[in-house]
């Protein structure tokens, strides 16, 4: 990678943050949750205050099944502040957190500070993050181990973003034979590898490739939330290049991705972990995802503005999600996550 491209990567991360602030239509609001109608219980037969939302993830106990999804990598004071606020907020609220892409730290050593977060979140799961396509661009086991080490991570996201790479003029588009390279990383790193999309959804075929590679953790990251394709279009805003706009609604909606994933993982019940993300905006959306089989729910956009503010704002936003999730469980008559999980009887037919 050239110095020019390194600088471009760092600048692009800040461009992404600005685009999220400037364009309300980047949040597509079409993940499919409106298609899921739940059955209200006027006599729920549970004590609200006794509802148990606790769960475990990657060997650590959480207050409820929330993962702060990857938001931003890069370097600079603003990004460092966002990541530290998120990590400290995750620790106080007892939820998991994933960082954004760590690719930049391999070309800009100062970027490591953005990912040195374990001191801020000593007891909750932290996930490192590398773009899977970078395994075809010179990154390998050494870099994956370094990404895990700086974060003292409990797991490693390998993210799949073919659409985002396709609409970037500087994108890395060689996705050939990644399955074998993912398998080698999954075999050789000391923590679980999690395969995730970034907003277009994992299909059953993608999950099958992941399973053959030894992956047991999948984040469907479906369509309907933040459109990275639209962000790339906005970042350039060239009249002769509307590729990102054309593909802004490409992919599997989150609801459909979850429904594909469950049967694909059926043979691995008890050993596989399914994470829902993509347009989850409140605790009711989270409840719907768990009903559809998700073990964890990834949320990013609802926490970004809070993270730009303070740790306290992050904690407040997480507690709001937790209250909404607990209230949905109460109104469905569910006292535990086991009552909610994979329970299609809660969906009105």
Curated annotation (Swiss-Prot):
Kindly indicate whether the keyword Isomerase belongs to this entry.
Answer: yes
**EC number in record:** 5.3.3.2
Gene Ontology molecular function, alphabetical? FMN binding; isopentenyl-diphosphate delta-isomerase activity; magnesium ion binding; NADPH binding; oxidoreductase activity
Gene Ontology cellular-component terms for this entry are:
cytoplasm
Instruction: Identify the CDD domains for this entry.
Output: IDI-2_FMN
Primary location class: cytoplasm
Q: GO terms for biological process? A: isoprenoid biosynthetic process
Q: Report the top EC class in one word.
A: isomerase
Q: Where does Mg(2+) bind?
A: 165
Keywords attached to this entry: Cytoplasm, Flavoprotein, FMN, Isomerase, Isoprene biosynthesis, Magnesium, Metal-binding, NADP
Query: Its catalytic activity?
Result: isopentenyl diphosphate = dimethylallyl diphosphate
Which residues of the sequence carry a binding annotation for FMN? 69-72, 101, 129, 196, 226, 279-281, 300-301
Its subcellular locations are:
Cytoplasm
Keyword NADP part of the UniProt annotation: yes
Stored InterPro entries: Aldolase_TIM, FMN-dep_DH, IPdP_isomerase
Subunit-structure text: Homooctamer. Dimer of tetramers.
Recorded family membership: Belongs to the IPP isomerase type 2 family.
Protein name from the UniProt record:
Isopentenyl-diphosphate delta-isomerase
